[in-house]
């Protein structure tokens, strides 16, 4: 370790101990040296004994800085790792830090714009930041070219070395978890950190965020539900992003929304509709929809529209994941736990050899008590959470896209019920889910699939005669080979008459599999199965000749 890493590690240890987080060290024989070492650091007592463990953990992470704050935010969505009282505290972590010097931001902007002064591109540049977070901060200005108000987002200087150093330490801690906790291996701590690292590094590239914002804006162009500010790509780079400045009411300011005459029920329902539209229609969803990133337009309060910013984190689901997710929700609310278990196996979320009966019983045990509440009070996010936590006991692999989805759904629900406590998520979402599933089957779906594949077949059509000729020629050669092998087998004197049958079948299957492997690679595993069956049959025939 470098001297800098040693100093940072000392600061982390001192911070953890000053908040009494040594309580998290399990009392096991393997941890005895660690606990004895802690007792030797008697001059670092717990200075916050009046606070509960969850709050102390949150405060410690806030003190350690941006990397640890964001790590805590991510861990708050993994409630299989922590009990609820700790996970709830982690969810309160705020990504707010002191701004860096505006002059440094100005220098970075000038460097990104080819060394020209800020005044060459922008008017009214405000040296004082409008907002500041752990990764970047925002300044206001006007475009010189058209006079439009914009915000300029700038990455914090020299943050990458800090992030890499802290991530290295977090990886080391993660490698200790399987040794210290009996259930540590199942929790896959290294995968959790790797997932976090990818998310964090992605946030450092503002070109990625620019592309995400442009895509979301295109998806909701002319939509009455959501507005994404315009991005000006000519001014964007990895370390800087320029987009339209928006004016709106923070979605968390319920009093201001009510004062503006906002239709709160419609606003809450539209939040749910926006989320499910992103997931199921677009397969591309804003995955950081906490209240700080959502505003409501001042205009048309009777027909309210959301404004979304900060598109650094997005998620996507493939067609299979979307179908299984929609069917899971519907099966759950129909209390069809057998269907839920089968869907998890069919989707590949749990291993194929999972005992479906045991899995169904586990899901029923965890989920049935949820229905003690009125349907309107049931949380979609917690439904997913319970299902995933149960599935992890059956070796469910970590699904990063589903973790993002569940976190976002919790945000959407929290905002919706803050706006309108009587919000019935199931009533709002059920028609959408049923309509989407219906749209995936039947004649319209077949027509759509044909349209998607039509260009491929049009391209291949001129090659069809040649492909047919090649197939017939290879088929004739195959038949000749099979006949030759069969004649050779018949000439042999075998002790058991059945051996010829097995050897012939084996040869046919092997050659058929070889032929298909060469001429029809798109058939997937079928040639392999034919060849494997042929080898087995051949082996049986050979055994019968002995």
Curated annotation (Swiss-Prot):
<comment type="function">
    <text>Is probably a protein kinase regulator of UbiI activity which is involved in aerobic coenzyme Q (ubiquinone) biosynthesis.</text>
</comment>
<dbReference type="InterPro" id="IPR004147">
    <property type="entry name" value="ABC1_dom"/>
</dbReference>
<feature type="binding site">
    <location>
        <position position="153"/>
    </location>
    <ligand>
        <name>ATP</name>
    </ligand>
</feature>
<feature type="domain" description="Protein kinase">
    <location>
        <begin position="124"/>
        <end position="502"/>
    </location>
</feature>
<dbReference type="InterPro" id="IPR011009">
    <property type="entry name" value="Kinase-like_dom_sf"/>
</dbReference>
<keyword id="KW-0547">Nucleotide-binding</keyword>
<dbReference type="GO" id="GO:0004672">
    <property type="term" value="F:protein kinase activity"/>
</dbReference>
<dbReference type="InterPro" id="IPR045308">
    <property type="entry name" value="UbiB_bact"/>
</dbReference>
<comment type="pathway">
    <text>Cofactor biosynthesis; ubiquinone biosynthesis [regulation].</text>
</comment>
<comment type="similarity">
    <text>Belongs to the ABC1 family. UbiB subfamily.</text>
</comment>
<feature type="transmembrane region" description="Helical">
    <location>
        <begin position="501"/>
        <end position="521"/>
    </location>
</feature>
<keyword id="KW-0418">Kinase</keyword>
<feature type="binding site">
    <location>
        <begin position="130"/>
        <end position="138"/>
    </location>
    <ligand>
        <name>ATP</name>
    </ligand>
</feature>
<keyword id="KW-1133">Transmembrane helix</keyword>
<dbReference type="GO" id="GO:0005524">
    <property type="term" value="F:ATP binding"/>
</dbReference>
<feature type="active site" description="Proton acceptor">
    <location>
        <position position="288"/>
    </location>
</feature>
<keyword id="KW-0831">Ubiquinone biosynthesis</keyword>
<dbReference type="GO" id="GO:0010795">
    <property type="term" value="P:regulation of ubiquinone biosynthetic process"/>
</dbReference>
<keyword id="KW-0067">ATP-binding</keyword>
<dbReference type="InterPro" id="IPR050154">
    <property type="entry name" value="UbiB_kinase"/>
</dbReference>
<feature type="transmembrane region" description="Helical">
    <location>
        <begin position="522"/>
        <end position="542"/>
    </location>
</feature>
<keyword id="KW-0812">Transmembrane</keyword>
<keyword id="KW-0808">Transferase</keyword>
<protein>
    <recommendedName>
        <fullName>Probable protein kinase UbiB</fullName>
        <ecNumber>2.7.-.-</ecNumber>
    </recommendedName>
</protein>
<keyword id="KW-1003">Cell membrane</keyword>
<dbReference type="GO" id="GO:0005886">
    <property type="term" value="C:plasma membrane"/>
</dbReference>
<dbReference type="Pfam" id="PF03109">
    <property type="entry name" value="ABC1"/>
</dbReference>
<keyword id="KW-0472">Membrane</keyword>
<keyword id="KW-0997">Cell inner membrane</keyword>
<dbReference type="GO" id="GO:0006744">
    <property type="term" value="P:ubiquinone biosynthetic process"/>
</dbReference>
<dbReference type="InterPro" id="IPR010232">
    <property type="entry name" value="UbiB"/>
</dbReference>
């Amino acid at each position: 370790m470098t001297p800098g890493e040693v100093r940072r590690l000392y600061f982390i240890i001192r911070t953890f101990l000053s908040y009494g987080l040594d309580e998290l060290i399990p009392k096991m024989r393997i941890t005895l040296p660690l606990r004895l070492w802690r007792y030797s650091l008697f001059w670092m007592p717990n200075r916050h004994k009046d606070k509960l463990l969850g709050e102390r953990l949150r405060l410690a992470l806030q003190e350690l800085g941006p990397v640890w704050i964001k790590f805590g935010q991510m861990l708050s969505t993994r409630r299989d790792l922590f009990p609820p009282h700790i996970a709830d505290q982690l969810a309160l972590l705020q990504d707010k830090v002191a701004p860096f010097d505006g002059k440094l931001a100005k220098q970075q902007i000038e460097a990104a714009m080819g060394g020209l002064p800020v005044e060459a591109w922008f008017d009214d540049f405000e040296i004082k930041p409008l907002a500041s977070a752990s990764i970047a901060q925002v300044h206001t200005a006007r475009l010189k070219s058209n006079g439009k108000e914009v915000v300029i987002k700038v990455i914090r200087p020299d943050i990458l070395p800090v992030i890499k150093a802290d991530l290295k330490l977090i990886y080391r801690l993660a490698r200790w978890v399987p040794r210290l906790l009996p259930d540590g291996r199942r929790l896959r701590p290294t995968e959790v950190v790797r997932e976090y690292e990818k998310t964090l590094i992605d946030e450092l590239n503002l070109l990625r965020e620019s592309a995400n914002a442009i895509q979301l804006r295109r998806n909701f162009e002319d939509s009455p539900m959501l507005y994404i500010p315009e991005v000006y790509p000519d001014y964007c780079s990895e370390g800087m992003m320029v987009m339209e400045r928006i004016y709106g009411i923070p979605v968390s300011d319920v009093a201001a929304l009510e004062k503006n005459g906002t239709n709160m029920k419609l606003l809450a329902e539209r939040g749910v509709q926006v989320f499910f539209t992103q997931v199921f229609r677009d397969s591309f969803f804003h995955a950081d929809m906490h209240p700080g990133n959502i505003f409501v337009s001042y205009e048309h309060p009777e027909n309210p529209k959301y404004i979304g910013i900060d598109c650094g984190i997005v998620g996507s689901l493939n067609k299979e994941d979307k179908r299984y997710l929609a069917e899971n929700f519907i099966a759950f609310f129909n209390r069809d736990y057998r269907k839920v278990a089968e869907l998890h196996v069919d989707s590949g979320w749990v291993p194929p050899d999972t005992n479906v009966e045991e899995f169904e019983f586990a899901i029923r045990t965890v989920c049935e008590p949820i229905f003690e509440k009125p349907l309107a009070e049931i949380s979609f996010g917690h439904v997913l959470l319970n299902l995933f936590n149960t599935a992890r006991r059956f070796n469910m692999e970590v699904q990063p896209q589903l973790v993002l989805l569940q976190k976002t759904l919790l945000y959407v629900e929290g905002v919706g019920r803050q706006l309108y406590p009587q919000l019935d998520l199931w009533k709002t979402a059920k028609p959408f889910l049923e309509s989407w599933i219906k749209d995936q089957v039947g004649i319209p779906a077949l027509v759509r699939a044909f349209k998607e594949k039509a260009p491929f077949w049009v391209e291949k059509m001129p090659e069809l005669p040649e492909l047919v000729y090649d197939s017939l020629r290879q088929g004739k050669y195959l038949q000749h080979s099979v006949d030759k092998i069969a004649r050779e087998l018949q000439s042999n004197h075998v002790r058991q008459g059945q051996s010829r049958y097995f050897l012939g079948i084996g040869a046919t299957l092997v050659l058929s599999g070889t032929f298909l492997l060469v001429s029809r690679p798109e058939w997937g595993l079928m040639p392999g199965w034919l060849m494997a069956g042929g080898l087995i049959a051949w082996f049986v025939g050979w055994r019968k000749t002995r």
